[in-house]
Regions:
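C-terminal regulatory/oligomerization modules of transcriptional regulators
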Residues: 1-11, 60, 136-153
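N-terminal leader segment of winged-helix/HTH proteins
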Residues: 1-40
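N-terminal helix-turn-helix DNA-binding core of bacterial DNA-binding proteins
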Residues: 27, 31-74, 78
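Pre-recognition alpha-helix immediately N-terminal to the DNA-recognition helix
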Residues: 21, 48-52, 114
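Charged, amphipathic alpha-helical coiled-coil/dimerization segments
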Residues: 4, 84-143
């Protein structure tokens, strides 16, 4: 077979590519997450929006679509589409902001809170099993991920 002139600094050893290793590990983790969330009729982005909303409601009285997008680092339009779907599912609701009639606030319904409480143990269980294989290195991984995120803001 003809040898290709592959213009990569990792052409002789793909195991040296941090990006490739990261994306492979991410895909394995993400497949587990998607599979478990599917059993309770949620997608991963829906889970992120629901849990972000729940977390923000613990910290502040009113939560907007923009708050959810900012906190979850998701595109505002994507969050808007997900919110529309979650409203149809009866998991969240929109209300007019009590202090600004031009704005909406997003609230969890009782059914939405139940769904969050059903989903969290599934996702956290996957996290514990998947990242637990690192044993005592999980905290180091977390610190490195925080450092990467902060350095690339």
């Amino acid at each position: 077979m003809k040898q290709l002139d592959f213009n990569s600094i990792y052409k002789n050893d793909s195991q040296q590519s941090t990006g490739l290793l990261f994306i492979r590990a991410y895909h394995k983790w993400h497949e587990l997450i998607k599979s478990q969330l599917k059993t309770i009729d949620l997608t991963h982005p829906q889970f992120v929006v629901l849990t972000t909303l729940a977390a923000l409601l613990r910290q502040q009285e009113w939560v907007s679509q923009t708050d959810i997008a900012r906190f979850s680092d998701m595109d505002v339009m994507t969050v808007s589409q997900i919110i529309r779907l979650l409203v149809k599912k009866g998991l969240i609701m929109r209300e007019v902001h009590p202090k600004d009639s031009r704005a909406n606030i997003i609230l969890l319904t009782e059914q939405g809170l139940q769904k969050v409480n059903q989903a969290l143990p599934l996702v956290e269980g996957i996290d514990q099993a998947f990242f637990g294989k690192l044993e005592d290195k999980t905290e180091i991984l977390n610190q490195l991920l925080i450092e990467l995120e902060t350095a690339n803001d």
